[in-house]
Every structure is written in C-alpha cells, then in structure tokens.
C-alpha cells in the first residue's frame, strides 16, 4: 500500500475527531440560543464528591429522570412534565430526551453558600432551574433565585 492513501485515511480520522466534539459544542450553543425556556422548581443541597468536587444537587418537584419528557407549563409558567411522557418519541409537543435534573455545577466555593442561602429563603422567594430545550436536546442555563442567577445573587448578598 502506498503512503498517500494512508495519509489521506489519517487526515480523515483527524477531521472526524474534530467534527464530533465540534458538533456537540455547536448543538449546546444552538440550544442555549434558540431553544425554548422552561423553569423547574427546585431545592438545592450541597454534596461533596471526591472526583467531581462540590456541586449543587437538586431536588426537583417533579420526578428527576424521563426517557422522553413532554414539557408543558402550569398556570404560573413553571414546567410540568406531561403524564404522557414515555419511552417513545412523542408525536407532538416540546420534549426533552433523557431528562435528568439532579445537579447543577458551579464554583466550588459558591456551592456551600448556595445551600445556606437556600435554607434562609422565605416562602416568598422563588428558586428555579432554567432549562433550554430544542428538538429533544436540553441544556441547563442556570439556577435562579427571584429571577437573578445564583452566582450573581451570591456575589451581591455575601
């Protein structure tokens, strides 16, 4: 075999290796930019994982994992998962594939503060997770307290 076809094959593999993560990054940015927004009521707590560090674990008011979750909104504008969610692609409506909302990664020094803030919130304060959804793909945009991103809320209140 000549060296030219081997080089071409090697170049093709290199290009494919760049295209795969490039596509994943593009899909996430596309979902964040043009996806439909859904707010999920949550209550965080701060676990520690020696491999992942600190993060904010979330207790969603909804069940936290669905293969295909058909999303709707309640009267207050918060996301509810349709009782028709299943293991098959839905025929209509906005859906998220493999929806799992159980953690939100943030700066390690902020995670314990976020938990303390959550404990001190009054019943009038609102905490929610903002999720963008497009064609079955979802991306967590942020954790919010009273419509303020939690990172900004922490820096202004501590």
What are these model-predicted stretches?
Residues 35-37, 66, 76, 124-126:
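Extracytoplasmic
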Residues 79-158:
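Extracytoplasmic/periplasmic terminal helices and flexible tails
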Residues 27-45:
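Alpha-helical transmembrane signal-anchor/signal-peptide segments
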């Amino acid at each position: 075999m000549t060296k030219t076809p081997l080089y071409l094959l090697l170049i093709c593999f290199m290009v494919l290796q760049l295209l795969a993560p490039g596509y994943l990054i593009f899909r996430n940015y596309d979902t964040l930019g043009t996806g439909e927004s859904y707010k999920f009521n949550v209550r965080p707590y701060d676990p520690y994982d020696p491999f992942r560090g600190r993060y904010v674990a979330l207790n969603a008011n909804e069940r936290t994992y669905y293969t295909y979750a058909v999303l709707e909104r309640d009267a207050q504008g918060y996301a509810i998962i349709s009782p028709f969610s299943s293991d098959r692609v839905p025929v209509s409506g906005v859906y998220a594939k493999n929806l799992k909302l159980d953690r939100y990664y943030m700066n390690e020094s902020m995670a314990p503060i976020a938990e303390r803030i959550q404990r001190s919130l009054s019943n009038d304060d609102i905490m929610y997770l903002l999720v963008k959804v497009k064609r079955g793909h979802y991306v967590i945009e942020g954790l919010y307290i009273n419509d303020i991103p939690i990172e900004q809320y922490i820096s202004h209140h501590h």
